[in-house]
Amino acid sequence: GDRGSTISGGIKLATTTGLPEESFWTYSGRYETRRPSNWSEVETNAAQHKIGQAYQMQTYDGVRTFLGSGQGGISIGISWGGEVDRAIVNSFSGAGGGGHAIALLSLSERLDVSGRPYIWMLNSWGAQWGNAGWSEWSPNAVEQMLRHRYTASFGLSDMTNVKPREYTLDALKKDLRI
């Protein structure tokens, strides 16, 4: 039977085979274990969309910087429980639930009390889930998720030569005259 997948397996597929456009392999809203009948077209299209680099994401500032730079999106696997099954997530403990992979794709206009943006997360469960398939995660929740022992989080980019710089947003702000 099916045993699911891993973030590392998805990254390997994205770097070697590529990821097809959704129009070539549509998601029906239900789990399908068989390849579509147009498999050779899927492979040809996927080869045009390979990931060039994967960077481990370990901090909220790293997530914020990566998404804010427009380099790509973040593939994250977490322990999925009821606390994250909502349109706005403010905290995370990792209790109760199995593993689930989702994508962090953009900074939100919603800010926490420190002025840090929430992160937009896209789920695979369709538009009937959350806020039309999306959820906003607070900086606090993201930090808690990244510290959880079962979390795997990688920034994925089609840019092959980009290297992330190590710095904190607070340190950068000190050097700027804002």
Regions found by a protein language model. Give the residues of each.
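Predominantly the structural core of cysteine protease catalytic domains
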Residues: 1-122, 127-178
